[in-house]
A protein has these predicted regions:
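Glycine-rich phosphate-binding loops of nucleotide-dependent enzymes
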Residues: 1-441
């Protein structure tokens, strides 16, 4: 069968569950499933037919969900289930899932794997696109490895291991475990007290949040995406104003009336690696050397307030690209022409090289290869060991567990609990991520 469009793929029995769900938030489950497949003389007839078929699919594949629920009232785990139902309703025999656990709690991920095993047992083919080696080893029968757009290896999962797969993905041996000494926390560098943030639509996204980050430690914030972590980070870094509470950094106090923008926060000793490198971290149409000074272009070493010292900027960019292994190491190359991993290393190079007192890092390894992940993790730990305070926000629970000294868990804009990393239990964190407090668990 020749496939030239999504319609051709669906007709050939191929279904796709995208990393970012393709659902209409204000429609019900039933309306989302029937959308685009309407048959018969009336919409009501189509809905009745779809409802009967959905009830059968739910029973056959243990995909229970309230078909009359509106999508935006469902947790992400159930929204993903709706995407699977949509694909099965359209007759999918081959189901492709792209990074399916990126937005799930550990408990939701386990439930997804049970569903995928059920699909396999009933004769469906499941293709999992993921960079999470633990998941590959846990659920797959066969694994193929792509590197730089080429298929470089095929293995039976039972005949390989995480170390070999990582080496195949990167082209060299990769250190799988983060090696770090115990933290030696010093005085508080960042103190957040009773912080509230209300967005432009009047929704309270951050609710009475308080915590500290000390010099020489990494504090990780865990949580399913969309629970206020992004807004908290943007408030702390001066991108968004807040309505209540206070932030103290390097002895400076910021309140809802005594405000500080992102440039002021940088002067206070804060560096920020934003979670969306292309929207917040880079101007992709600019060259590498122009991006390497973004936000720091008024630095006297770059700028004598009459003109920019281009030669110095280019030489400085070359050194930083070499130190942070940015490839290709061409300071004149446009940022859009670098791979995602090298774009991220460009942002990391710019922020880490400023010798900040406080480093705020959002999703540091999103969309980067395992080799770049290893490198960025080493750099974060080196900053901690140099006595810097690090606030790490990530939806990757493995990353939070391996890098953090203390872990805060956010749900619905609130801090649900604090756990020492050495005592952390993945199941307990998963419950907190789902809004279940420890005493209620």
């Amino acid at each position: 069968t020749e496939i030239r469009s999504a319609h051709d793929a669906i007709a050939a029995g191929i279904g796709m569950v995208h990393q970012h769900f393709m659902l209409v938030d204000t429609f019900t489950v039933l309306e989302n499933v029937v959308l685009g497949t309407e048959t018969g003389f009336s919409l009501q007839e189509s809905m009745q037919k779809t409802e009967r078929e959905l009830q059968r699919l739910e029973k056959d594949y243990h995909l229970e969900v309230d078909i009359n629920a509106v999508i935006n009232t469902l947790p992400v785990g159930l929204q993903q289930r709706v995407e699977i139902l949509k694909a099965l309703y359209r007759g999918a025999d081959i189901l492709i899932l792209d990074e399916p656990t990126g937005v799930l709690t550990p408990q939701e991920a386990d439930h997804l794997f049970r569903i995928l095993n059920e699909l396999r047992e009933q004769g469906k083919t499941v293709i999992l696109i993921t960079h999470k080696l633990r998941e590959i080893m846990a659920i797959t029968d066969n694994v193929s490895v792509m590197r730089q757009g080429e298929m470089v290896a095929h293995r039976k999962t039972s005949e390989t291991d995480r170390e070999e797969l990582a080496e195949l993905m990167v082209g060299r041996k990769v250190l799988m475990q983060v090696d770090k000494a115990p933290a030696k926390p010093g005085s508080p560098m960042l103190t957040v007290k009773h912080l509230d943030y209300i967005d432009d639509f009047g929704v309270r996204r951050v609710k009475d949040v308080s915590f500290e980050v000390h010099c020489g430690e990494i504090v990780g914030i865990a949580g399913v995406s969309g629970n206020g972590q992004s807004e908290l980070m943007e408030v702390i870094t001066g991108i968004k104003p807040f309505q209540k509470g206070q932030i103290q950094i390097s002895g400076q106090t910021i309140t809802s009336t005594v405000r500080a923008d992102a440039a002021t926060m940088r002067r206070f000793g804060m560096a920020h690696v934003p979670e969306d490198r292309q929207r917040r971290g880079l101007v992709t149409s600019f060259s590498a050397n122009e991006n390497i000074i973004l936000g720091y272009h008024k630095n006297p070493s770059y700028n004598n307030f009459i003109e920019m010292d281009r030669d110095f900027i280019i030489q400085s960019c070359k050194k930083q690209m070499e130190h942070f292994d940015v490839r290709p190491d061409n300071p004149h190359l446009r940022a859009s022409l670098f791979s995602g991993g090298n774009q991220q290393k460009l942002v990391v190079a710019r922020e880490f090289e400023r010798d900040p007192a406080l480093l705020v890092v959002g999703q540091p390894t999103r969309g980067v290869d395992i080799g770049a992940i290893e490198f960025i993790h080493r750099q974060i730990i080196a900053m901690r060991d140099a006595g810097k305070a690090v606030l790490l926000v990530s939806v990757e629970l493995d990353e939070i567990l391996s890098l953090s000294d203390r872990i805060l868990v956010m749900f619905d804009g609130q801090i649900m609990g604090e756990i020492l990393a050495k005592d952390a239990d993945e199941r307990e964190i998963g419950l907190l991520m789902a809004g279940v407090r420890k005493e209620a668990a």
